[in-house]
């Protein structure tokens, strides 16, 4: 065999050997991301869970009383629950103290719901202020409509709307109730079916919080939303308040962001006060629960990403869970619910 042929043969064998050699870890195909969690429950602290559940079942008749792993619970037809822990003293319920502001339902006929609530004195309506001078409505669509995708108007915009004779749109919109333990509850219409549909929040940095939920919990975004990056997610809170609002002084509505788990939205505005948000454990809204298929895989992922773990995996009735802390100190429980679980 000539030198040229021997050289060619060596080259062929070398190529074959390299092709057959196992690829290194760095060259391996990336693992598929874990399936996004679904919204499982909202967990409230209450001095009287049974009374609270009766209130919600009356206000939202699609819901029903149940028990889940020993917790008194309210079941919504979209496979979402509100769980309760009985406490000896009223829980702190300041809606601006923590990341969890309020929670709410979609309803089929908002005006019909409003009339029903008015007929029942045990249900307290929470009015919306239309300006900082006073004046209230029960439904946001009974005052000047927002503009530019913002659900309110600033002082200057209200003055302009008055000057132009702008009229309320009427019809469905959003409204609020005061519930047991001083809970703040939103109901909005009109939708094809009644269901628990959102948790509204405050965040220190709304865009950064959205990135956090995407990165660590594989959250989905609302349609048409394009997230910022870590390089530009920190922004200054909008300078002007707008109305209508639950507070007479109005509220800051920019910036805003949010994510979706299953068919439940978690939306937020920036913190409304100058006081940093505190942890949610022990408050009226203690935490939210998200269901995952493989808790061990999620625990490993979150540890590797440096997420703050409030409680390592623990027994929760006939399943397991772990508790982590979100970007503004909100507690989030991950509940192991294998595929096919109810």
Please state what every model-predicted region is.
Residues 1-9:
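N-terminal secretory signal peptides that target proteins for export/translocation
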Residues 12-22:
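Bacterial N-terminal signal peptides
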Residues 27-34, 115-201, 220-260, 265-270, ...:
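Vicinal oxygen chelate
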Residues 33-68:
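Mature N-terminal segment immediately following signal peptide/propeptide cleavage
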Residues 39, 49, 53-57, 100, ...:
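Extracytoplasmic/secreted envelope proteins and their assembly/folding machinery
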Residues 43-48, 106-108, 201-206, 290-293:
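Short, surface-exposed ligand-recognition loops at beta-strand->loop->(often short) alpha-helix junctions
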Residues 52-57, 117, 182, 209-214, ...:
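Conserved active-site tyrosine of GNAT-family acetyltransferases
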Residues 76-118:
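Mid-chain, structured segments of secreted extracytoplasmic proteins
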């Amino acid at each position: 065999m000539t030198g040229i042929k021997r050289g060619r043969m060596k080259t062929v064998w070398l190529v074959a050997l390299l092709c057959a050699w196992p690829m290194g870890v760095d060259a391996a195909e990336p693992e598929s991301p874990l399936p996004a969690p679904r919204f499982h429950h909202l967990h409230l602290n209450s001095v009287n869970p049974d009374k609270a559940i009766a209130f919600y079942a009356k206000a939202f008749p699609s819901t029903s009383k149940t028990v889940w792993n020993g917790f008194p619970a309210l079941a919504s037809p979209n496979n979402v629950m509100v769980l309760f822990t009985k406490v000896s003293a009223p829980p702190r319920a300041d809606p601006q103290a923590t990341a969890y502001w309020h929670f709410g339902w979609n309803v089929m006929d908002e005006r019909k719901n409003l009339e029903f609530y008015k007929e029942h004195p045990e249900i307290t309506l929470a009015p919306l202020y239309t300006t900082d001078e006073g004046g209230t409505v029960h439904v946001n669509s009974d005052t000047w409509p927002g503009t530019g995708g913002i659900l309110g108007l600033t002082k200057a915009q209200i003055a302009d709307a008055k000057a132009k004779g702008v009229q309320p749109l009427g019809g469905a919109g959003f409204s609020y109730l005061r519930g047991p333990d001083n809970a703040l509850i939103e109901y909005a219409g009109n939708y094809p079916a009644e269901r628990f549909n959102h948790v509204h929040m405050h965040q220190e940095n709304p865009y950064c919080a959205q990135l956090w939920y995407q990165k660590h919990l594989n959250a989905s975004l609302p349609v048409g939303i394009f997230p910022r990056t870590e390089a530009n997610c920190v922004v200054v809170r909008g300078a002007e308040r707008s109305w209508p609002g639950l507070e007479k002084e109005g509220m800051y509505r920019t910036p805003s962001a949010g994510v979706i788990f299953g068919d439940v939205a978690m939306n937020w505005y920036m913190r409304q006060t100058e006081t940093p948000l505190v942890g949610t454990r022990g408050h009226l809204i203690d935490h939210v629960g998200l269901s995952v298929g493989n808790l061990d895989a999620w625990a490993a992922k979150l540890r590797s990403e440096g997420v703050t773990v409030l409680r390592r995996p623990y027994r929760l009735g006939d399943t397991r869970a772990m508790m982590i802390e979100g970007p503004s100190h909100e507690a989030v429980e991950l509940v192991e619910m294998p595929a096919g679980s109810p």
